[in-house]
Amino acid sequence: DHNDDWYFILTDVTDPVCVTALCKWAESTEPTEAALGAGVEDHRKFYFGQTNDKEYVNEYGRSVVTYADNLAEWADAAWVGSVGPFWPESVTWKWKVPDGVSVADLRDSERDLLEENRVNFMTAEYKHEYMKNGICGDGNFIDNVLGADYITHQIRENLYEIFIANKKIAYTDDGFALVA
């Protein structure tokens, strides 16, 4: 039996080639409108990974990659553990401090490159340590992508419940009010 009812994926893989493959795979899980219209279930996924490659580039919008000097700190898992349990619309991923994650030892040029390449990292700025920038590989904020996925899922669930529970939805103000 196959259970595809999950959302986040994290692995212990840190090799850049494998991280990129997982980012690409997560990107491929978002169904097209045509597929959804044909009845394909929406089981989109979201990948969190980490690397110690200061030149790594993340190009995929359904993934987040963190940079860490010490991969044994599992910055990606610590970040998901500190923010993931909250409802998508109730939390911002930037500015969070995952437990047990050290500030990366980076020169300014390396920090700039990581930001340009859409890779998140622990930073110390203005006497505060936090995860920067809270973005996915396409530059969108993590909370925006997770929130949009959550809203999409909830709308679909609610519409199915309405259509199943009602014999007919009239094409009237009352029908529109029921669906709205």
Where are these predicted regions, by residue range?
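Extracellular Cys-Trp
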Residues: 1-97
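Alpha-helix initiation/capping motif
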Residues: 15, 107, 171-173
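Extended, charged amphipathic alpha-helical segments
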Residues: 68-145
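Structured, hydrophobic secondary-structure cores that serve as assembly/anchoring elements
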Residues: 134-180
